[in-house]
Regions:
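Catalytic cores of secreted/periplasmic lytic hydrolases that degrade extracellular macromolecules
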Residues: 2-111, 115-227
Length: 227
């Protein structure tokens, strides 16, 4: 069905600059690329070897930054650095900046990576290092086209130079987008992944069901052991 001009304009206004839609990934051409046949155990082992080191590294970097900024705010130092970060993360207050910078538990990132990339087998991951299904609306940035369209619109996803860059972009998106304000508010107060995933209903077209699925993935695979 072809979108009207009004629908297209509304879509661009309502959808965050970086749009993440897990339920649309297969339909728009993120189906598995040609890989050697693997058992479920082999597929999960490959996923962990590829993804978890990058998530560990980015999480540690972000936590160091968060703690440094928190200390600077208490001491009233590094004002230039604080102001630059507020601009980058669209934070108006010190508290909003801390909300933006605090990284959420790794178990959530791992579970989302597994879901969005079909355990690192999706085309978008293997051709563009895009493990979290991040959409692109900037024609000047590196990106990859989906194989199918939404109406007459080509769907574009970001292309990253590395898995680590994809992880860093994912955390930055959740730290900046207005769609995840409630998620940020809660993650400043708690590190409980099962409470936090309930606030990711706007990450996916699945809505509240998305959080339930993440909870199941975390529990079944014991991803909370990485927190």
């Amino acid at each position: 069905m072809k979108l009207t001009a009004f629908q297209s304009k509304t879509l661009l206004i309502l959808i965050p600059l970086i749009l993440l839609l897990s339920t649309a990934i297969y339909f728009y051409g993120a189906n598995e690329t040609t890989l050697p046949k693997m058992t479920v155990q082999e597929k999960k082992a490959r996923f962990k070897n590829l993804i978890i080191p990058a998530i560990d590294e980015v999480y540690d970097e972000l936590m160091v930054q968060y703690l440094d900024v928190s200390e600077s705010l208490k001491l009233g130092s590094d004002n230039d650095m604080i102001e630059k970060l507020k601009i980058e993360y669209k934070a108006k207050t010190d508290n909003e900046l801390l909300m933006a910078l605090k990284p959420h538990p790794k178990s959530i990132a791992i579970a989302q990576a597994a879901m969005e990339s079909s355990w690192a087998t999706s085309r978008f991951f293997n051709e563009a290092n895009n493990i979290f299904g991040v959409w692109s609306f900037d024609e000047d940035e590196p990106r990859i086209a989906a194989l199918k369209k939404r109406g007459d619109k080509t769907i574009w996803l970001k292309r990253y130079p590395s898995i680590k860059a994809s992880v860093r972009g994912y955390y930055r998106t959740l730290g900046r987008s207005a769609a995840f304000q409630k998620f940020r508010q809660l993650r400043l107060k708690t590190d409980d992944p099962y409470s936090l995933v309930k606030k990711l209903d706007r990450y996916s077209e699945k809505g509240a069901e998305y959080g339930d699925e993440l909870t199941s993935i975390i529990k079944f695979n014991k991803f909370n052991t990485y927190d």
